Amino acid sequence: MANKKTLNEDGVELTKADLRERFDKYNELYFECKLCGCKFFWLSSNHCAYGKYIAQPTKKGLISKIGVARNTIWIEENLRELLVHEMIHMYKRIIEGKAYDGVLGNGRRFRAHCKRLRDRFGLNIRIHGDFGFINKKLYPKTWEKVLLWLIDR
């Protein structure tokens, strides 16, 4: 089985070290270096999101993890938007201590941070960005399976 790679717009492999470098840069620019201790992982091609923030509880506290879609060719501005989006979730959870903020965590507090970044830095962070999946595996939804089963009877 070939090793799957996540590529940037130039066709160069994107690594977790690249994500860490950008995280550190955006943390300094947009979050006053308040975020730390984040791990990175690649989302499965079966996953339906481009990014995911997880706050994993441990005996020593919360461990933050940011997942990035593997089946996307990342141009720099889209990768920045995705990482900052997930960093907002991290900020709300770790710094503000808020585990819940509306549906999928993109509620009032999330939108307030998006507005702050737009007003102060001209940065547009979308709640549901579309960065273009490649080789997306499409699986039938449950109702489609039931319908097909009924038709075959």
Model-derived regions: residue spans:
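Active-site recognition of the HExxH zinc-binding catalytic motif
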Residues: 81-94
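Metalloprotease/metallohydrolase-associated module, dominated by Zn2+-dependent proteases
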Residues: 2-77, 94-153
